[in-house]
């Protein structure tokens, strides 16, 4: 056997060892080395991949943003003005469209006869109605409330009664004295009528008595004459 035909003994190849830093990540805040499975730092709870670099402010961009904020309000006013102008322009066009239709309607209407024109104008009818209304209102105003007639208004006594915060005034009136005089006059008139009836009955009785007394005397005188 030659030297080239010799085979090296079979040995398993060495596997590459995993690097010590593979899969681990350092926290950007506390520099703690966390495992690959952790998505947050186990000490400060900062998420994986957060950067602590402060952003640099660009002064030009800031100036442009401020200018845009203050410059944006005026444009809406122009839009409003444009809307108003458009509305003003549209109005006369609408009026033009409406006016011919109105004229057509007026032409289609029939002309009123002359008899309607000769009638009384509406102003006179309105004046008559208003006069009637005023007379009715005046009549209603003149109608006064019913008042007691047998009350003497001069004898008024007022009594004030207060219940809580409410005060009530009560007025007492006395009856008129005419009622008593009228009753006495009726009594006297009835008494006078009774006296007249009695006097008339007495006169009738006296007349009857005189007629009775006169007849026997005449008879007696006639008898005496015959005797003589």
Curated annotation (Swiss-Prot):
InterPro entries: RYBP/YAF2 (IPR039958), YAF2_RYBP (IPR033774), Znf_RanBP2 (IPR001876), Znf_RanBP2_sf (IPR036443). Residues 143-226 are annotated as: Interaction with GABPB1 and FANK1. Residues 76-98, 113-122 have a biased composition (Basic and acidic residues). It comes from the Eukaryota. It holds the Pfam family YAF2_RYBP. Residues 1-21, 65-156, 172-228 are annotated as: Disordered. Monomer. Component of repressive BCOR complex containing Polycomb group subcomplex at least composed of BCOR, PCGF1, RING1 and RNF2/RING2. Component of PCR1-like complexes. Interacts with PCGF1. Part of a PCR1-like complex that contains AUTS2, PCGF5, RNF2, CSNK2B and RYBP. Interacts with RNF2; the interaction is direct. Interacts with CBX2, YAF2, RING1 and RNF2. Interacts with ubiquitin and ubiquitinated proteins. Interacts with ubiquitinated histone H2A. Interacts with apoptin, DEDD, FADD, CASP8, CASP10, YY1 and GABPB1. This is RING1 and YY1-binding protein.
């Amino acid at each position: 056997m030659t030297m080239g035909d010799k085979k090296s003994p079979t040995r398993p190849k060495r596997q590459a060892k995993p690097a010590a830093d593979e899969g681990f990540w350092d926290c950007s805040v506390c520099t703690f080395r966390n495992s690959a499975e952790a998505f947050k730092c186990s000490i400060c709870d900062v998420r994986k991949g957060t950067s602590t670099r402060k952003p640099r402010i660009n002064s030009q961009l800031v100036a442009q943003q401020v200018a845009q904020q203050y410059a944006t309000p005026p444009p809406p006013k122009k839009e409003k003005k444009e809307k108003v102008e458009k509305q003003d322009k549209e109005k006369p066009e609408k009026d033009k469209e409406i006016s011919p239709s109105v004229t057509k309607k007026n032409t289609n209407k029939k002309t009123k006869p002359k008899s309607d024109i000769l009638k009384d104008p509406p102003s006179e009818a309105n004046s008559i109605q208003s006069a009637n209304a005023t007379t009715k209102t005046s009549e209603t105003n003149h109608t006064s409330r019913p008042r007691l007639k047998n009350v003497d208004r001069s004898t008024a006594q007022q009594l004030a009664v207060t219940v809580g915060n409410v005060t009530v005034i009560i007025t007492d009136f006395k009856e008129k004295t005419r009622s008593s005089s009228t009753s006495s006059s009726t009594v006297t008139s009835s008494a006078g009528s009774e006296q007249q009836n009695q006097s008339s009955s007495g006169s009738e009785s006296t007349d009857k008595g005189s007629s009775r007394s006169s007849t026997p005397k005449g008879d007696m005188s006639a008898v005496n004459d015959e005797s003589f």
